[in-house]
Amino acid sequence: MQYILEKAKLELIKILSPYIPESDIEIRNPPENIKADFAVPLFGFAKKQKLNPINLTEELLKKVKLEDTIFSQIEAKGGFLNFTFNPVKFSQAVFRNFQELEEKYGSSEEGKAKTIVIDYSSPNIAKPFSVGHLRSTIIGHALCNIFSFMGYTVIGDNHIGDWGTQFGKLMFEFNNSGDKNVIDANPIEELLKLYVKFHEEAKKNPSLEEHGRAWFKKLENGDPEATELWKWFSQISWKEFQRIYDMLDVKFDEVLGESFYNDKLQDIIKEAFDKGLATWGEALPDEVESADGITKQREQSESKKEIVALIRLDDYGISTPLLIQKSDGASLYATRDLATAKDRINRRRPVEIIYVVGGEQQLYFKQWFKVMELMGYKETKFSHVWFGLVRLPEGRMKTREGRVIFLEDVLNEAINRAKICIQDRNLNDREKEEISKIVGIGAVKYADLSQNRIKDIVFDWDKALNMHGDSGPYLQYAYARIQSILRKSGQDINFNLGVCRIQK
């Protein structure tokens, strides 16, 4: 199926080919100050023929005929031939495309036989699914839909954060003060309380951090008690996450999590050393913990350097080395991301892997993308689609301090506000429930996607749940009204009519 613009370009080539070789015909979009639809520069052809381009355009203007074409006007200006569509013929052709393709209008085969992996959402097990996670989830899901529409085989991968030092902290605190029955009744909120409590106690007694690291090391070594706790944390967390994904109508092609790649970590570290990229060096404790996703201020007296495996990138304009292994052999974020990327390449052979992750990690992605290139993985393109943070009026959300807004609370509030808007409608209870979910959650999605992607957002309940003006519900209402008008007309719409005859 060819769209009208493609057909129009072919028709323009046919019009000009008696006078200009096809290889010399270049079709451009004209600049904004030129009121035309296509512009054809003649400088290159004129130079070959040793002609003045202005004179050449004037000469062609006399020869080119537009009868029985989709074009209504031709203009010679500054070495360009500018062509304008016949508005009636063009509109009729567009609407014929609509009728022929219906909901597939706008799709293409650009991605035929090509695979793209999109890594998005990726919440952490045992932590709340906050409004901050909405951005990655909704942007990533939109990208999946767009690339699928373009003909790509899309693998939407929810790379769950189910590994890392935070699990050691939770295990320690659960054994110290947790209650399984209480947690089973309200998993995420109760696990959050344990996480916050651990950090509150660690401020008073920093040695607790070592207990957390020791528990995680037990997990990495396959300790039965640690493994059983980790499986339980993962199962109850995913059950909570799935309920939110169902509300958002977001589905994934793959949900493996960081832990899936544990048996591949040593291979990627060995490969980095074998290829002469990795060396042993020193890093401050803060730098090591930052590389494991932990941000913590230490006293100066604590800042004794640790031995780590790292990859220096100074020769490539990146002054911060990428840390890939702790001195005790424990893995870091980068270790797991490198192993994951290699596995995705081997299993999927994607042309591109896209990571939908916040802008605060731009440096980190530059680091390990460069490492993948240096290790020889050049056939796959790596892209970081980053976005601004969602902040609270009092500052950045902080899980360890319990300063978060649960996404489920936002979605439920949106549904309730939508119910109020439609309570006087002549609908039964089931219809009201269904419509309020569609409208409420649509409002939240639209409010996020309509923002400037790269700017930080200060969370505002009224803006997030807007039901009027420039909002999701407004667009949904407009669509419903148009469908109603078409149904009530009782006529088949014939787009061969003289549409666009009003030209004033």
Residue ranges and their predicted role:
Residues E22-G44, N52-K504:
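NTP-dependent nucleotidyl-transfer catalytic core
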